[in-house]
Amino acid sequence: MTVSSHRLELLSPARDAAIAREAILHGADAVYIGGPGFGARHNASNSLKDIAELVPFAHRYGAKIFVTLNTILHDDELEPAQRLITDLYQTGVDALIVQDMGILELDIPPIELHASTQCDIRTVEKAKFLSDVGFTQIVLARELNLDQIRAIHQATDATIEFFIHGALCVAYSGQCYISHAQTGRSANRGDCSQACRLPYTLKDDQGRVVSYEKHLLSMKDNDQTANLGALIDAGVRSFKIEGRYKDMSYVKNITAHYRQMLDAIIEERGDLARASSGRTEHFFVPSTEKTFHRGSTDYFVNARKGDIGAFDSPKFIGLPVGEVVKVAKDHLDVAVTEPLANGDGLNVLIKREVVGFRANTVEKTGENQYRVWPNEMPADLHKIRPHHPLNRNLDHNWQQALTKTSSERRVAVDIELGGWQEQLILTLTSEEGVSITHTLDGQFDEANNAEKAMNNLKDGLAKLGQTLYYARDVQINLPGALFVPNSLLNQFRREAADMLDAARLASYQRGSRKPVADPAPVYPQTHLSFLANVYNQKAREFYHRYGVQLIDAAYEAHEEKGEVPVMITKHCLRFAFNLCPKQAKGNIKSWKATPMQLVNGDEVLTLKFDCRPCEMHVIGKIKNHILKMPLPGSVVASVSPDELLKTLPKRKG
């Protein structure tokens, strides 16, 4: 079911069902979560039972559950994937997020399909094709700007989904093979080794060092807080938070932050609405800077910028909180701009390395002065000089608020009590317009104190604290002020609320798979390289069906044995270090975008620069020992080493 043109969907990540529930309570309109297998986060899977229990919880708030099945599949995995999709459909999930086009060739139920960010959707032509072959919602590449997003929105009827917060893959999603080339672990199969977070030395074409031992492929975190209104105007309707590995506190905090931001826009503009039901109240002040982040960037949404990288450290250093005045044997004295608390996480940067410690005890020694005793005193602290900057990456008191009940979400209900002395008629109508009527037979005489009786009825009917509802309006339409015992009224109200629960769940309509356009679309290319990630026969059949003539195998098939782009990225190190020919002026205008090198230990990667689309290609070669490994996902690859030994021929004699 596509998001209505005026409804905005806040889409939150969930590592598990418990986090998914909290995401919904903190304001998510939809949650994406891994199933028992084939999701692009290797250690974020959930059982069918957990998902089946999560679905009705979400649907009671009008929220949706999307399950990620967004790895590329080996032929051996197609049948298990087909069974899993059928099982997921039976649990009631709203949609699958997929990358592998082979899934569209399987015999699966009519479940709604969303195109994963791994599909690398950057062009109008590709977006329109995916919409026309049956995808209801498409996740655009993070690297797009507002004009590109708007053009795609105007050319397709698919709901536009866009990442607004969280970690950034330096490569175009689905176009990174460096992990598989170096370790055999495939990002396209949910097992990225995160080579982009390692330190590298950058050398020019003469071998001269441009930058030494910095995290040159590590990006700051995405933060589109300031661009939400512009993204809405460009056509984005699903606002996605990255983070299926993130903990409960992170998801609570970031979901609450964007819930408040979107609600403010909805209230201000009047022509927009949230995509699910209820109002959300938070019992803490959200802050994007108090949970994990590597610094913030809005990436390419407005224009290319030079400060998108987190080159010094891929770790979370938090917010500046003061400076170190003195370091003693077992403690340090600090001057701060904010109060400290026992349990705070503090750190300093020493030669670009984060030296962190937990404050076991803090003691105020003067105005804005504290003495801090760490749990363990890092030896490197003794290297720093007075007035060294101090950061806090764990605010203990703020975090404690998140470990408790930190949000409440309730759905509005209009209540009307009618009837007469022999029968009461109670009607509950939810904010979505679902209505139930419940009756209570008896003999209800007129009360001695009419005003008190009417107030008791109104107050009693509005007591919805143990439910997910709140009374938006209470109307009493009786022939007089009738006396109804509190015990009867409470039971009457509880039964009606249960009936409304059931009616709202019964009325929930989930979407279904979108039909293929007529006439059938044609894929915009006739030749697909390994970059298309075609890893199984069904995916080949899909692309052949839509006009592709020549299809190369996915990188994981080990047919690309030479040097190829193992990463394609919009991030450009020439631009970052003011070596871009497009930016050159005066005497250096003759610069050319000659290749450069990234060096990490024995690993040497060549950088080539394609200046027309403004991209950097990281060139590498798959290691020989990986070529000898079984193909990922194959039956052979799933056999344990002990089992493989059993298959060896027995020695004679």
UniProtKB/Swiss-Prot annotation:
Activity regulation statement: Iron-sulfur clusters and prephenate are required for ho5C2501 formation.
Phenotype upon changing residue 169 to A: Loss of activity
This protein's UniProt keywords: rRNA processing
InterPro entries membership: Pept_U32_collagenase, Peptidase_U32, RNA/ubiquinone_mod_enzymes
GO BP: any one term: rRNA modification
Free-text disruption phenotype from the record: Deletion of the gene results in complete loss of the ho5C2501 modification.
Consequence the record notes for mutating residue 580 to A: Loss of activity
Pfam families: DUF3656 (PF12392), Peptidase_U32 (PF01136)
First and last residue of the signal peptide: none
Role of this protein: Responsible for the formation of the 5-hydroxycytidine modification at the C2501 position (ho5C2501) of 23S rRNA. May be a Fe-S protein that catalyzes ho5C2501 formation using prephenate as a hydroxyl group donor.
Family that this chain belongs to: Belongs to the peptidase U32 family.
Quaternary assembly: Interacts with precursors of the 50S ribosomal subunit.
Protein name: 23S rRNA 5-hydroxycytidine C2501 synthase
